[in-house]
Design a protein with these regions (language model features):
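His/Asp/Glu-enriched, well-ordered alpha-helical/loop segment
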Residues: 210-231, 235-240, 290, 311-312, ...
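Short catalytic-loop micro-motif centered on adjacent basic/acidic residues
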Residues: 99-100, 130-133, 242-247
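Divalent metal-coordination and catalytic microenvironments
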Residues: 18, 36, 58, 69, ...
Length: 457
């Protein structure tokens, strides 16, 4: 309950009696927020100076979620989603910061286009924002001339949609040159398109253009993923490059990653997208092309193996790979259906559902969704509940049930693959830079997020 609140633009907020989920511990404390920062954590008396006082009794306070992989579609693809609508959905899901991929229109293959995305986001995004610079064979020489240490990362993700052969995994010479010269995180989509095409041709011979979607994980196969990931790791080790494998999907691949050193010492990291933990190939019969992703949703064994690797620290992050398309685009036949789906509003709820099932701790959720993205991408003063850090915070009620429906889906595309699911936790408040931007279904749309900054720059 909010005891006093003049308006959401108040720069002073006291959150009382909440259970902080932070840095491997849960403890009851108060949090004092002023001028956008966490000023004090501990036992704090109510202050009679016009501050907002929020009673957090019985609720759990997480650092704001940092989603390390989204596709918010702006510029150029805004019939699917845009920085305003998708950041709003993110806030309702407790996500306070995101890093957006380069496969917009135009692709983000130059600093001019990258800077334009930052300009648009500063005007439109309610959450904090960062962007990958796209890299492929066409702009490699320009990229390696840049001081890439100032970037959050470079990536090839999604660029294969505009031109075949754009994936670094299919171009070992390009990948090797990049690894030898790039100081930034290199985040790659790890599938060998040659293997995918061979598999696709086999199924076309049998089914023509009417290949059932259930064969998607056999077309975009374990072999296609494993061989690409294994080769990328070999080259990254050779050049001591900073490699990050996006959206891992197979149990076999998890064994390629280390868990015997802390994240800060790793030069090779990986992530799992939340849908690869939630769905498996048994769901194709029910949901069809709505759960067509690249890389594909795979087997129950893979799903369980990914969760195990997340828990034992071979997998470092949980992301969404939020990729909205219209229902019309998704409901086409297999080969015409677009790959990807919207997830950013529901990712924390899914992970909290795993907590409810006894599969993961709250502390581990905070580690993989808040702390580790900040560490991996060297994001300045975010991802932790610490004095002096930006007040990006998410307050959670673990005892409220609600069902995903068209009425509460906030994505511009208007649908979700988890529609009809009943969750047993809810995000009640979300703070961004000290502003209460989401409060039990209501938004403060007067504020805008900030550009994420890296400590390397």
């Amino acid at each position: 309950m909010v005891k006093q609140q003049k308006n959401n633009m108040s720069t002073k907020t006291l959150i009382k009696n909440c259970s902080l989920v932070n840095e491997g511990q849960i403890r009851v404390a108060d949090v004092w927020i002023e001028d956008g920062l966490i000023q004090k954590i501990g036992q704090i008396e109510d202050l009679n100076d016009g501050a907002t006082v929020l009673d957090g009794t019985g609720k759990f306070l997480f650092p704001g979620i940092i989603d390390g992989q989204v596709h918010f579609r702006e510029p150029g693809l805004t019939h699917k989603g845009d920085l305003y609508t998708e950041s709003k959905a993110a806030l309702a899901g407790g996500v306070t910061s995101f890093i957006d991929m380069p496969n917009t229109s135009p692709n983000v293959l130059s600093m001019d286009i990258l800077n334009e995305k930052y300009r648009i986001a500063a005007e439109q995004s309610l959450a904090n924002f960062g962007f990958f610079l796209g890299v492929n064979g066409d702009n490699l020489d320009e990229v390696i001339k840049l001081d890439t240490s100032k970037l959050l990362g470079v990536s090839d993700d999604g660029l294969y949609f505009t031109k075949k052969g754009n994936l670094l995994a299919d171009n070992p010479e390009t990948m090797e040159k990049l690894f030898a010269n790039c100081k930034s995180v290199i985040a790659i989509h790890s599938e060998k398109e040659q293997i995918v095409e061979e598999n696709e041709n086999q199924y076309r011979e049998k089914y023509g253009e009417n290949v059932p979607v259930k064969f998607h994980p056999l077309i975009r196969s374990e072999k296609a993923c494993y061989e690409a990931t294994n080769r990328a790791i070999e080259l990254a080790n050779k050049h001591h490059a900073r490699l990050h494998i996006l959206h891992l999907t197979t149990e076999a691949e998890t064994h390629l990653f280390r868990n015997d050193i802390p994240l800060k010492e790793k030069n090779i990291t990986t992530e799992v997208s939340v849908h690869h933990l939630w769905f498996s190939d048994v769901d194709y019969e029910r949901l069809g092309t709505l759960i067509k992703w690249n890389p594909a949703i795979k087997t129950e064994k893979d799903k369980k193996g990914l969760l195990k690797a997340l828990l034992d620290d071979r997998i470092d992050l949980v992301t969404t790979d939020h990729a909205p398309h219209t229902l019309e685009e998704k409901q086409k036949p297999y080969f015409q259906s677009m790959s990807g789906a919207p997830m950013v509003q529901h990712s924390l709820n899914i992970m909290l559902e795993f907590y409810k099932q006894g599969l993961i701790s709250l502390e581990k959720i905070a580690e993989k969704m808040c702390h580790n993205p900040a560490i991996l991408y060297h994001i300045e003063k975010r991802g932790f509940i610490r004095e002096g850090y930006f007040a990006d915070l998410t307050l959670v009620d673990l005892n409220t049930n609600w069902t995903v429906s068209k009425e509460n889906i906030l994505y511009k595309c208007g649908w979700s693959p988890v529609e009809g699911t009943t969750f047993h936790s809810s995000i009640t408040q979300t703070f961004v830079n000290g502003n209460l931007v989401y409060n039990n279904g209501l938004f403060n749309e007067k504020t805008r997020g900030m550009a994420l900054t890296t400590t390397l720059g």
